[in-house]
Design a protein with these regions (language model features):
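Aromatic- and glycine-rich beta-strand/loop motifs that create alpha-glucan
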Residues: 1-15
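Transmembrane helix irregularities
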Residues: 3-5, 158-159, 179
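Membrane-helix interface segments
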Residues: 7-8, 85-87, 91, 130, ...
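Pore- or pathway-lining transmembrane helices of multi-pass membrane proteins that form conduits
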Residues: 11-17, 159-177
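Secretory targeting signals
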Residues: 15-61, 91-158, 204-205, 209-219
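Terminal transmembrane helical anchor/hairpin motif
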Residues: 25-43, 166-243
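Transmembrane alpha-helical segments in integral membrane proteins
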Residues: 57-71, 76, 146-163, 223-239
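Helix-loop-helix units of permease transmembrane domains in multi-pass membrane transporters
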Residues: 66-98
Length: 243
C-alpha cells in the first residue's frame, strides 16, 4: 500500500481533536468539585456529534485517499497485473481502511483522556478515570462503524470518480440522525455508531442500568449488512479495469 507518504495519518487526528476539545471545553464550565458522573457526561458530549458526523466524514475521505493512491499513473492496472487475485487486493485495502478506523479510535480515546484529565484537575473534580467504561464505548464505536465503512468502501469501489463516491456517501451520512429515530435504523449502517451514543445518552439521563441499546436483533442485521457490502466491494474491485 502506498500510504506511507499520504496525508491520511494527519487527517485522522483532525476530527478527534476538534470534537473532544470543543466538547470537553464547553461542558467543563459547568463542573464543580461536587459534580458526579463527570467522565460519562464529557464522553457523551464529545462522542455524539463525532459518531453521527465527524467520524463517518473522516472515513469517507480516507476511503477516497486509499483508492486514489492507485488511480494515478495507471497504478490500478499495475496492481492488478500482480499474481494476486482482485478479491485479495480488495480485502487488503479494506483491512487498511479498518486499521485507519482503529487508529482514529485510539487517537480519540487518547485525546479525550488528556482533555478530560486537564478539565477535571482544573475544576478540582476528584472523580476517578473510568478507563473500562471508555474502552467499552470506544470499542462499541469501532465495531458499529464496521458495516458503515464497508458500505463506504463498496461505494468507493463502484464509482470511479471520487466526486461521485464522496457525494453519495455524504448524502447517506447526513440523514443518519433522522433515521436513527425511526425503526429503519437497524438497516441503515450510517447511523449505527450515532445510535449507540444516543442510547448511552438515554441511559445516562434516565439513570437506569437497563441499556437502551439491544444487541438483538441489531447484531444479526449488522452482520448481514456488513457481509453484503463487503462482498459487493470484493467482487467489483478492479472489474472495470480488467475489461
Amino acid at each position: 500500500m502506498k500510504v506511507k507518504r499520504s496525508k491520511i495519518v494527519p487527517l485522522i487526528f483532525i476530527a478527534p481533536l476538534l470534537v473532544v476539545v470543543s466538547g470537553v471545553a464547553s461542558l467543563s464550565n459547568y463542573f464543580t468539585p461536587e459534580y458526579t458522573n463527570t467522565w460519562p457526561a464529557m464522553f457523551i458530549q464529545s462522542a455524539l456529534v463525532y459518531a453521527y458526523y465527524l467520524l463517518p466524514f473522516s472515513m469517507i475521505v480516507v476511503c477516497v485517499m486509499i483508492a486514489g493512491r492507485e488511480t494515478g499513473n495507471n497504478g490500478i492496472l499495475k496492481m492488478l497485473a500482480l499474481p494476486v487475485s482482485r478479491c485479495a487486493l480488495s480485502i487488503a485495502k479494506f483491512c487498511v481502511l479498518t486499521f485507519y478506523l482503529f487508529m482514529e479510535m485510539v487517537v480519540f480515546l487518547v485525546v479525550f483522556v488528556i482533555a478530560g484529565l486537564i478539565a477535571t484537575q482544573t475544576m478540582e473534580v476528584t472523580e476517578t478515570l473510568p478507563i473500562l467504561y471508555l474502552l467499552k464505548w470506544c470499542l462499541g464505536l469501532f465495531l458499529t462503524m464496521l458495516p458503515c465503512i464497508a458500505a463506504m468502501w463498496a461505494i468507493t469501489v463502484l464509482f470511479e470518480k471520487p466526486l461521485l463516491s464522496v457525494g453519495l456517501n455524504l448524502l447517506l451520512v447526513i440523514p443518519g440522525v433522522l433515521v436513527a429515530n425511526t425503526p429503519l435504523w437497524i438497516a441503515y449502517p450510517y447511523c449505527y455508531s450515532g445510535y449507540l451514543v444516543s442510547c448511552s445518552l438515554h441511559d445516562f439521563t434516565a439513570e437506569t442500568s437497563d441499556a437502551a441499546f439491544s444487541v438483538f436483533p441489531f447484531l444479526p442485521c449488522a452482520i448481514v449488512v456488513f457481509g453484503l457490502f463487503f462482498a459487493l466491494a470484493v467482487t467489483q474491485f478492479g472489474k472495470k479495469e480488467m475489461r
